Regions:
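Positively charged n-region of N-terminal signal peptides that target proteins for export
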Residues: 1-6
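Signature of exported/secreted
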Residues: 23-317
């Protein structure tokens, strides 16, 4: 009977151990003096109807960063020197086709990809808090000038320049980092816990985003997080310049993602997401004028972000 009770206690103990897991505080804690690497790629397909005709345009944009941690202050805020070490820009559509990958075509730059090629070796400094907040961005003017010096005349308003803005403007760099590091919860979380955040992201059209994340599991020092987001255009955002035109966006959609974060450093090992947006683009003369043209549009985007403390030996899928 005693041995039976011991077996029961062992079973109960194993059951309890299997059903509970310690909560963790997920924070970005990069080590001063160390170097990390980031690469991200977005594959986007747009279906739009222009003057009664259907058009399909596909964009593929990618970038890689060497992230050197210059210093970490007493509050844990990290100042990084980010240097572009990889660039990708591909576009296919009715007007033009461009195919550039610096990893596969070193020294060979097709027309329409000059701006992305000019990123290589250029960079900026950025300060991030342990909660992933962007505190400061510096060196952007020098970055812009270095890229501008490599560009041919007449590229303003081209698809390449529009796609390049998040990588060479202070607002774009800040917004891209904000969207990348927005995931950290305010408090400790355990498996099954969820948290939410609302933010406005202006990488391209200004979007209001409501996100909910849930910690699925803790395994081998890695936190696996599932995310869902809903998004819609900010109706108060000013029109965007598009060459000779101005455009306003009326879009809405959703995003689903899975993120893996290293518990020890808070490094985002990977994020894979699928996003769908649909709605209309309004071509306008002034912010308050009625649309001169309305373009129905649907956008499907697959995106991947990876970070590591060493360079990858394989290409990003």
């Amino acid at each position: 009977m005693r041995s039976f009770r011991i077996v029961i206690l062992m079973v109960v103990g194993m059951t309890l151990c299997g059903s509970t897991a310690s909560a963790v505080e997920l924070r970005l804690q990069l080590e001063e003096g160390k170097t990390y690497y980031q690469r991200m790629k977005a594959d986007q397909q747009m279906e739009q109807e222009v003057m009664g005709g259907e058009q399909t345009v596909r964009h593929e944009v990618g970038s890689g960063l060497k992230m050197e941690v210059l210093d970490v202050d007493a509050q844990g805020n990290m100042r990084l020197r980010n240097t572009y070490n990889w660039a990708l820009f591909k576009q296919s559509g009715p007007m033009s086709s461009v195919d550039y990958d610096s990893a596969r075509q070193p020294g060979q730059v097709p027309v329409g990809a000059e701006g992305f090629a000019a990123l290589l070796g250029q960079g900026y400094t950025i300060t991030l808090s342990p909660q992933g907040k962007v505190l400061d961005v510096n060196g952007v003017e020098e970055l812009q000038q270095a890229v501008q010096d490599e560009l041919p005349a007449g590229v303003a308003g081209t698809p390449m320049m529009n796609a390049l803005q998040p990588y060479i403007s202070e607002q774009g760099i800040s917004e891209l980092a904000k969207a990348t590091f927005a995931i950290y919860p305010a408090n400790e979380v355990g498996p099954g816990d969820s948290w939410t955040q609302e933010l406005t992201v202006a990488v391209g059209p200004e979007m209001m985003v409501e996100s909910k994340w849930m910690l699925r599991e803790l395994e081998g020092g890695v936190a696996v997080i599932d995310g869902t987001s809903t998004m819609k255009s900010n109706p108060k955002a000013p029109p965007m310049d598009a060459g000779q035109m101005k455009v306003k966006f009326d879009l809405s959609g959703s995003d689903r993602s899975t993120t893996r974060i290293a518990e020890a450093t808070g490094l985002i090992l990977s994020t894979v997401s699928e996003q769908t947006l649909s709605g209309q683009i309004h071509v306008v003369a002034t912010p308050d004028s009625p649309p001169m043209m309305t373009i129905p549009i649907q956008i499907e985007t697959s995106a991947t972000t990876e970070m590591s403390d060493r360079m990858w030996e394989t290409e990003l899928d």
